[in-house]
């Protein structure tokens, strides 16, 4: 059993965390504003960078790792102080391997290990061959039953996976639009969007046209990103592990230990009702992937093959007598009412803003409708020996099947909730992941004592 070294990108990973140390000497330039101060700051920054790069190179040279035939990983760093860490395969809940484009060009991989029952993870920068060797030793893929989405299933996977990037891009664009910028490629891109918005403004007010065009562009960007991940996507299962891999530009692989699975989350939204299928997310330990494990049609048996014993909450609405209305409707109702008030005021003061404000109001009204759906359907049940729950978050209705045997249950009651015999129930899973169900009847919780 030979010891192996880390990839040189581990130095860059360390230097990225210390970037503030290089920027601190540049703060004096903001006050001095002269070439001498700038030269001094650059020299100090270069000196700090050189020292930290030398220390990082020494740590990289002194750091080693090895894994034996039983899947026990030992990592050591020896530079003045000896630091060792040991992790057995039986203690590992999940493992992910990420290969962004820059890493692939350098032959590197980022391996993240998620120990069972812990929030702290272990990140290793290894070569592509060593990363695959480590994954095969700790979570072997033997006699795996694999499934690759085809045709319409791959299209549904791409559409339902296009969620998070749009929100982040919208925030970034909003920040960039609020700041002055020099004419460059970014300015040219905004100029093209302005032309599209001007074309749409022939039929719509300018603000509304910009909102629609920007939303369409961001959704298309998110769709392209999700479609790139759906390329070469495969999900597989063995007797002890569950995994998936895929990606065209950014390669991603995930392996989960079946004995350490926390829950399976089936997310419903207007898009899932239109496509007739739902994305399924699986959590193990503190690993909460943003990419669905698979897209499942309710009449298909594949989910039961991957997760035997998987159960869904009942579809019938729950009894809403005494259920807390503020807990469900206030988060969306307050901004919706405020936008309605601003729309009414703008009708007489700034008519040009009326239609854009109506668009924002419509978004909050849709969130209010989703809150009503959660008010009717949110709850917790025991189905076929499995604990299942349903809760509403934004536009998504989460149908969750608990797969671990020992989630921690916390009940919180206000005086008004105690008067109607209802409680807020929080489930805490190994790794610190939490799910909250609001205003549940105490009489429907036989596994708790009230």
Task: Please give the residue ranges for each predicted region.
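N-terminal basic, Ser/Thr-rich segments that initiate or prime the first beta/alpha elements at protein or domain
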Residues: 1-450
């Amino acid at each position: 059993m030979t010891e192996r070294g880390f990839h040189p990108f581990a130095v860059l990973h360390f230097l990225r965390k210390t970037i503030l140390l290089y920027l601190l000497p540049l703060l004096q330039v903001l006050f001095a504003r002269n070439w001498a101060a700038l030269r001094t700051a650059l020299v100090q920054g270069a000196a700090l960078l050189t020292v930290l790069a030398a220390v990082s190179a020494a740590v990289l040279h002194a750091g080693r790792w090895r894994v034996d035939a039983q899947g026990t990983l030992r990592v050591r760093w020896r530079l003045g102080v000896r630091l060792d860490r040991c992790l057995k395969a039986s203690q590992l809940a999940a493992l992910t391997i990420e290969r962004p484009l820059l890493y692939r060009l350098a032959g590197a991989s980022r391996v993240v290990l998620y120990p069972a029952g812990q929030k702290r993870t272990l990140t290793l920068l290894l070569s592509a061959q060593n990363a695959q060797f480590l994954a095969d030793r700790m979570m072997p893929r033997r006699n795996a039953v694999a499934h690759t989405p085809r045709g319409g299933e791959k299209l549904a996977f791409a559409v339902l996976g296009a969620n998070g990037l749009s929100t982040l891009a919208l925030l970034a664009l909003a920040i960039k639009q609020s700041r002055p910028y020099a004419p460059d490629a970014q300015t040219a891109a905004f100029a093209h969007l302005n032309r599209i918005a001007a074309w749409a403004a022939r039929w719509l007010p300018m603000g509304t046209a910009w909102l629609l065009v920007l939303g369409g562009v961001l959704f298309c960007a998110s769709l392209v990103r999700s479609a790139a991940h759906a390329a070469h996507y495969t999900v597989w299962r063995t007797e002890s592990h569950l995994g998936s891999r895929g990606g065209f530009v950014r390669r991603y692989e995930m392996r989960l230990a079946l004995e350490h699975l926390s829950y399976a989350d089936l997310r419903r939204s207007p898009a899932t009702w239109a496509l007739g299928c739902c994305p399924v997310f699986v959590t193990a330990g503190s690993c909460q992937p943003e990419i669905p494990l698979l897209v499942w049609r309710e009449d298909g048996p594949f989910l039961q093959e991957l997760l035997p014993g998987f159960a869904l909450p009942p579809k019938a609405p729950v009894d809403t007598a005494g259920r807390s209305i503020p807990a469900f409707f206030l988060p969306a109702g307050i901004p919706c009412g405020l936008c309605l008030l601003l729309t009414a005021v703008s009708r007489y003061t700034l008519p040009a803003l009326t239609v854009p404000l109506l668009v924002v109001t419509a978004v909050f009204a849709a969130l209010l409708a989703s809150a009503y759906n959660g008010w009717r359907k949110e709850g917790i049940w025991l189905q076929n020996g499995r604990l299942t729950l349903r809760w509403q978050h934004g536009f998504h209705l989460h149908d969750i099947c608990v797969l671990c045997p020992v989630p921690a249950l916390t009940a919180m009651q206000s005086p008004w909730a105690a008067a109607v015999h209802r409680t807020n129930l929080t489930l805490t899973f190994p790794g610190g992941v939490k799910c909250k169900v609001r205003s549940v009847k105490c009489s429907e919780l036989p596994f708790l004592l009230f």
